Amino acid sequence: MPNTDVSSLSMLGHQTETASSPEEAVLEKVPSNHAGTDYVVRFTAPEFTSLCPMTGQPDFAHIVIDYIPGEWLVESKSLKLFLHSFRNHGAFHEDCSIYIAKRIVELLDPKWLRIGAYWYPRGGIPIDVFWQTGKPPEGVWLPEQGVATYRGRG
């Protein structure tokens, strides 16, 4: 099994402050040791938090990010801190969701990526945001995201 050189990473293995905004947050990548193999990497953030840009009240989401790597993998600690940087950031649900996906695409240039952002109700209406870069490669096992549609007490 090949070793991955992590010497260029600034966060992994170090105490790291959370960035004050998503724009300031650093996302890092590591080389994929399986660049010629199509497989799915999934990150799930069941307690994602941001702020409503109008009221400043917290918004919560269950976010699922699936991607098929090319040459690079996202370093998970940097992703965790990037997602955490939204905690005090005011933005609409759609903006947060698409910004997260596009930052990862910009960093990695993956073969394929999708995001499912399942936002808890605001004003009595849950907002779910879905985006992907295109069709996934054929023959890849792509599990459902497994997040139930919001039902409330119904």
Curated annotation (Swiss-Prot):
Pathway: tRNA modification; tRNA-queuosine biosynthesis. Coiled coil: none annotated. Residues 1-21 have a biased composition (Polar residues). The active site is at 52 (thioimide intermediate), 59 (proton donor). Its EC number is 1.7.1.13. HAMAP family: QueF_type1. This is NADPH-dependent 7-cyano-7-deazaguanine reductase. It comes from Rhizobium etli (strain ATCC 51251 / DSM 11541 / JCM 21823 / NBRC 15573 / CFN 42). The gene is queF.
